[in-house]
């Protein structure tokens, strides 16, 4: 559960790092296929806060579940939104103009085209980004832009030119096993 909560924030932060600053981000707090019996209002509220802290300009969510529950029975969801709005607005105001900083977890467009699929399985096409959640859970701040110390993991190493790799090595560079294998 803890890793999932960190992943909510980090997944959105990674997406935001790829966008230009003038893009308005309307982040969806996913409530489907959940019902009020499988996802608490507190969890929905926490996810709204995590999206706000990650920098969402606005939040989108399904107020009504997919079970066609009558509106009067969904009133607690409406109350949650009403009650959390001042808190979310304050967090958004405090967050405005700020960016994540810390260990640079590098990401390159096109890396998915370089993935190896030795087993021929569909799940091998999913880029594994365990470090996005691991370091924050250990208390190590991260960002998704180049910094003085960076981590190059997995297939990302194949996305770097030799010159870029040498430049990164001139700073501080951490390689995971797969990246080291690709570099060598």
Q: What is each model feature region?
A:
Residues 1-130:
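Hydrophobic targeting/anchoring helices
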